[in-house]
Amino acid sequence: MAKILVLYYSMYGHIRTMADAVAEGSREVSGTTVDIKRVPELMSEEALRKAGAPADDTPVARPEELADYDGIIFGSPTRFGNMAGQMRNFLDQTGGLWAQGKLIGKVGSVFTSTGSQHGGQETTLTSMQTTLMHHGMVIVGVPYSCAALTNMDEITGGTPYGASTLAGPDGSRQPSENELTIARFQGRHVAEITQKLAG
């Protein structure tokens, strides 16, 4: 039985929607258990309320929990071409796991959202992957066997580095069906590889 964690930070809900799709894909793989958790929020309740961020009652993860999983799929919105500070802060607390080699050989994968088509999707994904590589994780992306990656019928997120969505400059655009298809594919693909490595 492979244990997958979908771990995310989402301010306006785009990444939460993508996380649900990723988890849905992972759950399609028999013999896989999937948990969805979020990293702790760093902004005050007042600041979140003023920004119009919706409440999120998803369980909050602790860094030491990561060692309990065979595969971890991380999701974060883009902040100036990098992961959000909340995810960075969480990963910066995993030094103890790194020192003990607790994540070596575990599967790692990433997904993101950006405000625009060229708003830093790939730099965000690769910056997240860099941290996972320092932990010795086995990085899994989205291969081109996912036909939705080559969809030219719409402006869409999705890269070989990981699923992505375009939120628009005001955050009003929600993940498209094509983007959710890529997210589900990624979740399924990660679970299949995790099963092979954990078995």
Curated annotation (Swiss-Prot):
Write down the required cofactor(s). FMN
Q: Which InterPro entries does the record associate with it? A: Flavodoxin/NO_synth, Flavoprotein-like_sf, Flavoprotein_WrbA-like, FMN_Rdtase-like_dom, NQO
Q: Does the keyword Metal-binding apply?
A: no
Q: Where does NAD(+) bind?
A: 12
Show the GO MF annotations.
flavin adenine dinucleotide binding; FMN binding; NAD binding; NADH:ubiquinone reductase (non-electrogenic) activity; NADP binding; NADPH dehydrogenase (quinone) activity
Q: Which residues does the annotation say bind substrate? A: 98
Q: Where does FMN bind?
A: 10-15, 78-80, 113-119, 134
Domain of life from the UniProt record: Bacteria
Q: What are the entry keywords?
A: Flavoprotein, FMN, NAD, NADP, Nucleotide-binding, Oxidoreductase
Task: Specify whether Transit peptide is a keyword of the entry.
Answer: no
Q: Where is the Flavodoxin-like domain?
A: 4-190
Entry-linked HAMAP family? NQOR
What family classification does the UniProt entry report for this protein?
Belongs to the WrbA family.
Quote the PANTHER family the UniProt record gives: FLAVODOXIN-RELATED PROTEIN WRBA-RELATED (PTHR30546), FLAVOPROTEIN-LIKE PROTEIN YCP4-RELATED (PTHR30546:SF23)
Name of this protein: NAD(P)H dehydrogenase (quinone)
Gene source species: Alkalilimnicola ehrlichii (strain ATCC BAA-1101 / DSM 17681 / MLHE-1)
